[in-house]
Each structure stands twice: as structure tokens, then as C-alpha cells.
A protein has these predicted regions:
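Extended active-site neighborhood of metal-dependent phosphoesterases/phosphodiesterases
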Residues: 162, 208-332, 369-375, 381, ...
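Bacterial N-terminal signal peptides
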Residues: 11-21
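Acidic-and-aromatic substrate-binding clefts and catalytic sites of carbohydrate-active enzymes
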Residues: 203-212, 286, 356-364
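N-terminal active-site segment of His-dependent metallophosphoesterases
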Residues: 142-211
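Active-site glycine-centered loops adjacent to acidic/histidine catalytic or metal-binding residues
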Residues: 154, 201-202, 231-232, 352, ...
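Intrinsically disordered, low-complexity segments enriched in small/polar residues
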Residues: 23-144
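Short acidic, glycine-rich surface-loop motifs adjacent to enzyme active sites
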Residues: 339-358
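Bacterial N-terminal signal peptides that target proteins for export
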Residues: 2-11
Length: 452
């Protein structure tokens, strides 16, 4: 009898444990939505409803122009998912409607659309998994308002002024410093509404995944979207010189290849799907070939990211996988700038190193071609990094390589440096900030410039 009671008790215990666990697993569905208002006006919440689940964060009643907001729903019943719909409207009665369905069984699905596709664009990226996150954008095709961009470079985890940048001993101090920098930029965003950020290379110290993880951990806390490129520390300094033993990748090109693969993934899975206007890129993921350059329009300006520099090329082999072929971007750039010029845009180029490797390793013919593109297709400015020195140059024009384009160097994020660009039609004003102590301190104003 005693044994029977013990068996019954154990049986009931496991029954309770099973249903408790099942309920816990059944409730583990959520959808976090980030919505960026890239229009000219405030968006007003028109309607929001949930078919399944509850709100953990409700959609805000309004979204200021340039603002990014988040809202979230989660499951609250046994073996159910989350499903809902939210609609925002602009003053011209144009709407964006977001529908999400994250079921307990089956695939996630999303329907994001506008009732005025002639004037507006919608796009999204992400959305996979039980706890899904999607980034949604609502663009007006012809933005006329003024806007702001933060331009950065060289986060370079785990580099600081002291210590070994490749040592994990520098990890916590680097993260603390850069957490302050992010906090300062978010404060500036709350005051002045930054539409997006650009980071011009050296996203890691040597291309290692551990340092890339630190970058995302810290900089994904920015309250505005950002678009980055690679620098020499990501896929040039480490060629044939860096393995990822912890990931069982013993190729000496492991770190460089991972930097390239991650960049390609950002371009195809995020930037392109978020539907940056007139988006174009130069990389074929099928044959692993191209420069990784990409571009987009915002307002009257065409933005171009040229990665390390426009003439960089390298072959990144592997003992098991196909070779990656990084090629110069000049031919792609010529076609890209010509199309932007035909659309009536002024252009801004971004790349990492415009002072050392680009000048020293490019042929005279390549430098001549680059200058001709700048002069022919209304390139008004070039933003670079690499030197860790904030500066402006070519104020009077006539540079033998950059022509009459103004050159701005954004310093280094690991030092707290960044630039705030105020854009009015085809004119920009640029100010230098430092945020290493957690607050945005204005250092100086650079001379502005205008496109034609």
C-alpha cells in the first residue's frame, strides 16, 4: 500500500510538472516591433487590436517625424501565440498597417502595407523565432523636411587608450566606455531626433566574433537605425592570420571571412529588406564576389558606403568553403552615382580609409577616375575614419584625389568621438561631439557644404 501511494504521488508530481512546463512553453511567444517614422509628419495611432495575446508594451499614440518607437505583444494562454494589427495615419490620411501572427504551431507571418504606395514605401526585416523582433520602416518617397544624421567610425572593440585591444581584459572597460557613448547619442536623439547613423569601419579589432558580439551588444541600444561598413581591422589586417578555434574554423582567413559574411548578411537581410529608398548593392552572395558597397537615397541626398576603400581587393580562401572575391567598387560606383545624378541627387561618399591605404595602394589611373566621378556626379562630401583624429579638410577644394568634395573625419567611437550632420535640402552643417562620459558635449562646428 505504501509503495502504491508513493507511485501515485510520483505520478501526480510528473503530471503537474508536465502541464506546468507545457503552459510555460505555450506562453513563450512574443513579437517586438520597432517602427521608424521616416516621413515629413507626425504619425497618429489610428487603431490597434490583438486577436491573441496581451500587450506588454502598447503602441504609442503618436510618432514624431524621425522617431523610432517600439511596442510588444506576448501570449497569455496555454498553447497559443500572438496575433495583432496596428495602424498609424499621416496628416494626408496615408496609413501604414502592420499585421503580425506568431502562432504556437506554424510559421510566423507578417503583412505590412500602405494605402498610398505612390507616395510612401514600407519594408521590414527580422521576424523569425518564438520571440520575434521585426524592424519596420515607413518612408515618404520625397522627404522635404530637414533631418539629422550621426556619422561615426572606429568602435574597434576592445581597443582603448591603454591595455591590449585583443585581450578580454579590455572587454568590460570598452563596453562601459561605449555604453556611455551610446547614451550620449541617445540623449542627443531625444533632443534633436536623429534619423539614422553611419559607421565607417573598424567594427572590430581583428575580425573576431567575440568583439563583434560586444559591438552589437552595446550599439544595438541606439534609438535610431544605423548602417555600417568595414575597415582594415575587419578584413585586411587579418588576411591569412586569424582563426576562430572556438567555432572550429581553422582557416587562417576565418576572421576576415566572418567579417565579410556578416556584412553581406546585414546588407541582404536588413538594409535591403528595410527598403532603404533606391537601395543598391555590389555583392553576389551566390558566387561570393563584389565590393560590398551599397547606397540609398534620403531626401535630396544619395548616400554611398564604400567599405575599407574604393580600390581594395583581396581573395579570401578556405580549405572547405568557396573563396570570397572582394573587388574594387569603382565600376559599380560609376553606375550608381550616374543614376543618382539622373534623379537630381547630390551624393555623399562614406568609407573607412581615405588617407593611407587608399592613397598609397591605388594606381594613378584609379585615383584619376575617382576624382572624375566626384566632379562629374555632384559628390559634395566624403566621410572617413581610420586615423582616430577628428578633422575637416579640403575646405578650399582642388584636392588631387577628392576634387572639390569636403572631407570629414569622424575620429573614433572608442574615444567618444562622433559627428552630427544637419541636413537641409542639399546642404549640410557638421558639428563635432564627444560622449565618453555619457553626455553629448559639443566640441566645435566644422564648415558646412552644399551640393548642386
Amino acid at each position: 500500500m505504501k509503495n502504491a501511494k508513493q507511485i501515485k504521488f510520483i505520478y501526480m508530481f510528473f503530471i503537474i510538472l508536465f502541464f506546468s512546463s507545457s503552459f510555460a512553453f505555450g506562453a513563450a511567444r512574443s513579437t517586438l516591433i520597432s517602427l521608424k517614422n521616416s516621413t515629413d509628419n507626425v504619425l497618429i495611432l489610428d487603431s490597434s487590436s490583438l486577436k491573441h495575446g496581451i500587450w506588454s508594451t502598447r503602441p504609442p499614440k503618436e510618432i514624431l517625424a524621425g522617431r523610432l518607437v517600439t511596442f510588444m505583444s506576448e501570449s497569455n494562454k496555454f498553447l497559443t501565440g500572438v496575433e495583432g494589427t496596428t495602424t498609424y495615419k499621416a496628416p494626408d490620411v496615408s496609413r501604414i498597417t502592420i499585421h503580425w501572427d506568431n502562432p504556437y504551431i506554424g510559421s510566423n507571418s507578417y503583412d505590412i502595407n500602405t494605402n498610398n504606395p505612390d507616395s510612401y514605401l514600407t519594408g521590414y526585416s527580422g521576424g523569425k523565432g518564438n520571440n520575434a523582433e521585426i524592424k519596420v520602416t515607413f518612408f515618404k518617397k520625397n522627404i522635404t523636411r530637414d533631418y539629422k544624421v550621426i556619422v561615426m567610425s572606429d568602435p574597434q572593440p576592445w581597443r582603448l587608450e591603454t591595455g591590449d585591444p585583443n585581450s578580454s581584459a579590455n572587454k568590460k572597460p570598452w563596453e562601459n566606455r561605449n555604453r556611455n557613448v551610446v547614451q550620449s547619442m541617445n540623449e542627443l536623439h531625444s533632443q534633436r531626433l536623429v534619423d539614422f547613423g553611419i559607421i565607417n569601419g573598424d567594427m572590430t579589432e581583428f575580425g573576431r566574433q567575440s568583439t563583434r558580439d560586444s559591438f552589437y551588444k552595446i550599439y544595438n541600444k541606439l534609438l535610431f537605425p544605423f548602417y555600417f561598413g568595414l575597415g582594415n581591422h575587419d578584413y585586411a589586417n587579418n588576411v591569412n592570420d586569424c582563426t576562430e578555434i572556438g567555432k572550429f574554423n581553422f582557416s587562417r582567413n576565418a576572421c576576415a571571412r566572418e567579417s565579410v559574411n556578416n556584412m553581406a548578411s546585414e546588407i541582404s537581410n536588413h538594409y535591403q529588406k528595410e527598403l532603404l529608398q533606391n537601395f543598391s548593392s555590389d555583392y553576389n552572395e551566390s558566387n561570393l564576389s563584389g565590393s560590398l558597397a551599397y547606397s540609398w537615397d534620403f531626401g535630396s541626398i544619395h548616400y554611398v558606403q564604400l567599405q575599407f576603400h574604393p580600390t581594395y581587393q583581396v581573395e579570401l580562401g578556405h580549405y572547405l568553403e568557396p573563396t570570397i572575391h572582394i573587388k574594387p567598387s569603382l565600376e559599380w560606383l560609376k553606375n550608381d552615382l550616374a543614376k543618382a545624378y539622373a534623379r537630381g541627387k547630390a551624393s555623399i561618399l562614406n568609407f573607412h580609409d581615405g588617407t593611407d591605404h587608399f592613397i598609397e595602394t591605388s594606381t594613378d589611373e584609379q585615383k584619376k577616375e575617382f576624382k572624375e566621378l566626384i566632379e562629374k556626379y555632384n559628390v559634395m562630401a566624403v566621410f572617413i575614419g581610420h586615423t582616430h583624429q577628428v578633422e575637416e579638410s579640403n575646405q578650399s577644394g582642388g584636392d588631387p584625389v577628392f576634387g572639390n568634395a569636403r572631407i570629414y573625419n569622424s575620429g573614433a567611437l572608442f574615444q567618444g568621438d562622433f559627428l552630427l550632420m544637419n541636413v537641409k535640402n542639399k546642404c549640410i552643417d557638421v558639428s563635432v561631439y564627444n560622449g565618453r562620459d555619457g553626455t553629448p558635449k559639443k566640441i566645435q562646428d566644422f564648415q558646412g557644404t552644399c551640393g548642386k
